């Protein structure tokens, strides 16, 4: 079917561009740049991710109502707001993917991925640090969207188990980003938890890995739970604006 083939191609190209952008972050000079547009390398990474996000939006044009195509922007705004509120705390969670989870449940995996990328593009328009974590946002959007399509979030136990699985996956990816893009030295996050693990194991890199896994697992369980609760108890007058055939259940 030609109508679906070109959509799949755009999604595949978008993911490939995102991976290419991440590959650019493993060069040593990337970790030394703070402001995105002060370096050709970080500016190129940002541009690749922007193109990838546009391709994801384009792949869904005509497939969902036009109003739903705007949801990733609102989801990204939620991510940035909640993320900025928690980034300076020592709480071992981030809450910067709640918007991604909400949109992925409503609109499916592709627009969930678009929400994750939009968050990265907007958040990385000035600070280059966030750009390296683009694959994590894509993974979360895709995973939540696919699980939602299979009705996994209808039971609390499955919500928790799904959050654990997504947390482990995103945690492993985040650890790889920290090691390869930033030589194992995060610039933000719950440093007290990292110091706690380092005190116990006397190994800085192991402490960073354990902190990343712990934080991501806890964060994603609560992220999915919050997203499901928001949609479950959304007033009907609002819910009817985003309820369509494929997400009615």
Per-range role (PLM):
Residues 2-3, 57-67, 147-158:
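Membrane-interface helix-boundary motifs at transmembrane edges
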Residues 2-50, 83-90, 130-132, 152-249:
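Membrane-embedded alpha-helical hairpins and interfacial helices in multi-pass inner-membrane proteins
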Residues 6-11, 64-71, 110-112:
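Membrane-interfacial loop-to-transmembrane alpha-helix junctions, especially the N-terminal start
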Residues 8-11, 51, 57-62, 140-148:
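Histidine- and aromatic-rich ligand-binding microenvironments
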Residues 50-77:
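Helix-loop-helix hairpins and the membrane-proximal interhelical loops
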Residues 70, 74, 78, 99, ...:
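Alpha-helical membrane-protein architecture signal
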Residues 74-76, 104-106, 165-173:
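Small-residue-rich segments of transmembrane alpha-helices in multi-pass membrane proteins
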Residues 76-148, 158:
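Alpha-helical membrane segments and adjacent membrane-interface helices in multi-pass membrane proteins
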């Amino acid at each position: 079917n030609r109508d679906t083939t070109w959509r799949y191609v755009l999604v595949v190209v978008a993911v490939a561009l995102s991976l290419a952008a991440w590959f650019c972050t493993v060069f040593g000079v990337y970790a030394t740049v703070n402001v995105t547009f002060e370096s050709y390398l970080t500016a190129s990474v940002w541009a690749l991710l922007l193109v990838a996000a546009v391709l994801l939006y384009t792949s869904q044009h005509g497939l969902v109502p036009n109003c739903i195509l705007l949801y990733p922007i609102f989801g990204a705004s939620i991510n940035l707001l909640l993320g900025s509120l928690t980034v300076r705390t020592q709480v071992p969670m981030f809450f910067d993917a709640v918007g991604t989870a909400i949109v992925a449940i409503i609109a499916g995996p592709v627009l969930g991925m678009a929400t994750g990328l939009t968050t990265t593009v907007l958040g990385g328009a000035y600070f280059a640090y966030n750009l390296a974590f683009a694959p994590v946002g894509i993974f979360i959007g895709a995973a939540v969207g696919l699980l939602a399509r299979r009705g996994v979030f209808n039971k609390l136990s499955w919500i928790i188990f799904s959050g654990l699985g997504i947390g482990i996956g995103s945690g492993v990816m985040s650890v790889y980003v920290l090691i390869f893009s930033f030589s194992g030295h995060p610039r933000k996050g719950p440093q007290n938890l990292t110091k706690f693990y380092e005190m116990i194991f006397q190994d800085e890199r192991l402490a960073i890995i354990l902190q990343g896994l712990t934080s991501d697992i806890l964060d994603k369980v609560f992220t999915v739970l919050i997203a499901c609760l928001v949609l479950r108890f959304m007033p009907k007058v609002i819910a009817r604006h985003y309820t369509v055939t494929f997400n009615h259940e």
